[in-house]
Amino acid sequence: MSASFVPAMHDMRARRAHRAAVARTLLDGSLASAPEATTVEWRQLGELPEWCLWPADTRLRLLRVTGALFAAPGMRLWIDGRRIEIARTLIGTATLARVMACPALPIQAPAVPPAGDLQRLFDASGRAVLLGSLDAAWMRGVAGPSLPAADARTAPCPPAIARPLVGQALALIAEIPVEAA
């Protein structure tokens, strides 16, 4: 696992608190009766990224920024002002500007959807990337139900693409405060 995905916690108390929060999520969440929940060891609990436990609104922001980063190679070609305005509404003006300025990763951009489908594009792409960044099935089982549902055909993004995108998205949302829509 990449060091950037392990919670940046230096003291044992914080690490134990993180593991306990993950354990509560496993025991109380939708994964409680799943076989994956019974095979997770205490040491593994600390490997779940912190974003999986964030409040729903913060997690949704990460998801949409991640989806926008994934779609950015195609977005840079947009000339439709309506589509750009919808993207601004979904992730914020400053965030959109930063997404557009981020160096492009060598990925094929998703097809350009009609303007009304941008939320679905950002949500589905963000979900695929976030889930693709997770190493283990139990992690995807914890994170999956807390993310907006996607088309069943949407597969997780390959880890080599997903991890850098999630790292960029985490850096962006840490630098830019939540913007009013």
Question: Where does each model-flagged region fall?
Answer:
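General marker for long, soluble alpha-helical cores
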Residues: 1-181
